[in-house]
Amino acid sequence: MIKNLSRYALVTAFALFLSGCITRTEQQPAPVDEAKPGTEQPAQPTQPVPTVPSVPTVPAQPGPIEHPDQTSQPAPRVRHYDWNGAMQPMVGKMLQAQGVTAGSVLLVDSVNNRTNGTLNAGEATETLRNALANNGKFTLVSAQQLAVAKQQLGLSPQDSLGSRSKAMGIARNVGAQYVLYSNATGNVNTPALQMQLMLVQTGEIIWSGKGAVSQQ
């Protein structure tokens, strides 16, 4: 019996020994890795965000500086003449000239400007036609007939015939027996008016006159 107790005590002691080993094994903490200096990865540098450069503002260009035209010529002076005062006495003398057949057709050519300046020859021509209106001796070629005859020569109604030969040619075309050819000559400030009455058939000068024209 003592032998059995000893065996039981030995088994019990061995069991206690094993349980203590197991307990120590279970209580050991898990190994912890220590951080070693110098092994950390370097931080990646932050890439700069690219920026778009701003476009500089272009300043508004000033407009061209306007200068008054220094080369422009002054407007020509407008002159007014007493055409009627010069023409009435001359027309009266022409109507009394020798060799003029009453009732004949008369072509009044435009007054030609032969002065050294600019004057309104159209105004002079109109005044001359008015001075001859209802003269009792000549029948005037109408302005419409004269305009048509000028157009046949390639001229405008306002154009002067410019020469005696052209005036005579148109007079024949319109059936006129006489032509009154007139020129303004000399200084434009104090022009002279020359008038010639010509016979279309022969070109003979039946009458001529000259008078001074004053400015108004």
Curated annotation (Swiss-Prot):
It comes from the Bacteria. A lipid is attached at residue 21 (S-diacylglycerol cysteine). Residues 1-20 form the signal peptide. PROSITE patterns: PROKAR_LIPOPROTEIN. The keyword Secreted does not apply. It is found in: Cell outer membrane. One of its GO terms (cellular component) is periplasmic side of cell outer membrane. Keywords: Cell outer membrane, Cell shape, Lipoprotein, Membrane, Palmitate, Peptidoglycan synthesis, Signal. GO terms for biological process: peptidoglycan biosynthetic process; regulation of cell shape. Pfam families: LpoB (PF13036). Residues 28-77 are annotated as: Disordered. One of its GO terms (molecular function) is enzyme regulator activity. Interacts with PBP1b. Regulator of peptidoglycan synthesis that is essential for the function of penicillin-binding protein 1B (PBP1b). Belongs to the LpoB family. HAMAP family: LpoB. This is Penicillin-binding protein activator LpoB. It comes from Enterobacter sp. (strain 638).
